[in-house]
């Protein structure tokens, strides 16, 4: 897990239910008086069973969620998002922004003083697979660019 800007923005590779739960719990312990916002998605053409579980965990441990693309590969981003939504408590604030760069920029530029942000799922990765294209993408660079 990597921390940017004091304790406000965190980046982690968490891409399984247990890892997402652990990352959210860790950040909550570092930001006990803050609300917690999380950005995440799930990989396409991979374990579909974990999607609703990750949605449930996020809705139980975070105060708001932005769902976005991870590596959708050949799968429809909307289909992946629908699977995640099946586990989410409808009472929580949810945004769906499939473009990961836009999702990160939106979250970073609208982050309030009383919030912490977890950008989960890609961590150290430097590419994103969409369809048959492998694009250059890095969560940390996207977050830092949003701060400029």
Please annotate each region the language model reported.
Residues 2-148:
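ATP-dependent carboxylate-amine ligase
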